[in-house]
Amino acid sequence: MSYEPRGDHDKGYGGGGGHDGLPPRNRGRRPVTDYGASVVHYMRHRQPRYRGSYAGEVERPSPSYIVDMLPPYARVTNPADSVPSRHLHSSLNKIKHPINVVRWTPEGRRLLTASSSGEFTLWNGTGFNFETIMQAHDSAIRALVYSHSDDWLVSADHDGIIKYWQPNFNNVESIRGHTDPIRDLAFSPNDTKFVTASDDQTLKVFDFAGGSTDMTLTGHGWDAKSCDWHPSRGLIVSGSKDHLVKLWDPRTGRCLTTLHGHKNTITKTLFERVQGNCLATSARDQTARVFDLRMMRDIALLRGHEKDISTLTWHPVHSNLLSTGGSDGSLFHYLLDEPNTAPDGSVMPIPAVYDTADPSSAPAQPIYPAHKIPYAHDFAIWSLDWHPLGHILASGSNDRITRFWSRARPGEAPESFNDRYHIGEAAAEAQGTWDRRGGRHMRQVEEEQELEDEMDGLVDQKMPIKGQPGVGGGGMMPGLSFPSIPGLPLQQVPSSGPGGSGFIPPPPIIPGVGGATGVPPPLPFPIPGMPGLPAGVVPPPLPGLDLKNPPDFSALAEMMKKAGYQPPPPPGSAGAPMPPPGILPPGLIPPPGAAGFPMPPPGFAPPPLIPGAGGPPGGATHPDGGNDQYDSSGRRRAPLPSQEESLRMEQSKGNYTRVR
């Protein structure tokens, strides 16, 4: 664990000077997990397995032993060293929604979360800061899984829609899977098929390439809440609201066996990934069970929860470490090879099933948690997922917060065990490990940090409108954005876009307004409808109109409003009828070349276009019909940009220049 300074020296606020005359703001330090040193230390001192695994220096409760920390792969036989007992960071969106699914990307660099609003959110896996957000579904996302080849991502929502995604979040395909909400899905070992569980009481096996249904598994009497495909065998497991756990043969669609171990709705079924010999299930009866697939019976009964268990997950390295999340926000960790008797000692330890004379008839061994985090979240934990390296656990909850957990560093155990997540806010405040005012302040600081991360988030990959031939200003017609007065030339300046130079019209000069004191220059052409005036002569002002004291239009509008008069709707709007073809609305000047109106000389801006009428002849339009809406609200909804370009930008600022 290292720390990243929160000062932003480049922008002038945070660590350096002030910004716009304001004093610098100190953001403190953001915790960052740097596991590179631990992995390098393990790689340098590791030994082949046949000679015995490297145990390394024993970690002692002192900060000086932090350098001896090793990744979980270095100590496969010591799962207690990988128990995530320390809170790292809490990540929350600006617009908060319940987090239904959390999934680490296959390489472990980012965490992907899916919310009830149908949005994907990417969090950095090292600094836990916000990276990007996108609208993935129209309804709540209920399931999310990566393929075993790491080439595809499949998501399912509350409307029964299944979507295919590439790793860069390019939506390739969208199919209708079920008519009811889809609760879970899983890939086959070779990624050619995947299975879904739905509230319509069925499971469906889909062909991934064709997107068609190969098989429908029926047999549950109520909603199917969970499913999983064995990582190396042709075996599917499902859990339902009818309290049953069923095992299926995906080749024939036949139900192999039914496990009657729970007394309430099954919430999660998951195969163990390391050896593949066990199956874990959780239910709303406050228990979780571990089944041995070789004996087709339960071998362990996980107790300790005071409320329903909503989810569980296996450790990716240690096959005997299981974590569960409760509906009350508690997070428990179980070591399956240690019984960990009841805290009050009321239950005597029972030997394991494998140690009895008759394993087929022996009762399941009760196991109590090796570590408890009773106040991990304020509400139910919906999803848990381990980092591929096995050192960080991510949790998503109904309290709209995504939290990261890791093992305590040497010397941090007493402090981490007495925080508000372990003993509660009141007890932590009494012990001095948490301050209520400071907690609110930290929550505000975290929200401000997320806002800053959003400002530095990934930009939209949609290209801006390029300049059209003969049209400057990035593709915008002159005279549309900035009104111009005939007779006033436009200033030609180089354009910042790739389209080259263009005209940027200055604001109009009105006599008597601002710093304009002169009269407009003479017009180079006669005004239609005034044959008595020679060319170049400006007509006199209307009687009672003082050019030095122009009328206040806001005051006139207020007077009309008080008198009960409504201003006429603008021509071409929804409330005003369009005139017949060939007749202009009242108050509009005919376009150049119509009704005897002369064309403007070269270099002059054309007049504004008529509402509801087409553009000028030969005018170019945008390829997508002008429906280009750039989202500048602070949220960047786009796929990830190139990492090489980001690296070059950082190197140009002087960062990441040293070779590690």
UniProtKB/Swiss-Prot annotation:
Main subcellular location of this protein, as a coarse class: nucleus
Record's keyword annotation contains Membrane: no
Localization terms from the record: Nucleus
Xref: PROSITE patterns: WD_REPEATS_2, WD_REPEATS_REGION
Gene Ontology BP annotations: chromosome segregation; mRNA 3'-end processing
Gene3D superfamilies: YVTN repeat-like/Quinoprotein amine dehydrogenase (2.130.10.10)
The WD repeat ranges on this chain: 94-133, 136-176, 177-216, 219-258, 261-301, 304-344, 376-415
The keyword Ligase is annotated on this UniProt entry: no
Signal sequence range: none
Biased segments, Basic and acidic residues type: 1-12
SUPFAM superfamilies: WD40 repeat-like
Entry superkingdom: Eukaryota
SMART domains: WD40 (SM00320)
Alphabetized UniProt keyword annotations: Chromosome partition, mRNA processing, Nucleus, Repeat, WD repeat
GO (cellular component) term, any one: mRNA cleavage and polyadenylation specificity factor complex
Segments of this protein annotated with the region Disordered: 1-32, 562-660
Residue ranges, compositional bias (Pro residues): 566-610
Function: Required for 3'-end cleavage and polyadenylation of pre-mRNAs. Also involved in chromosome segregation where it has a role in chromosome attachment to the mitotic spindle.
UniProt-recorded name of the protein: Polyadenylation factor subunit 2
Organism: Neurospora crassa (strain ATCC 24698 / 74-OR23-1A / CBS 708.71 / DSM 1257 / FGSC 987)
Gene assigned in the entry: paa-1
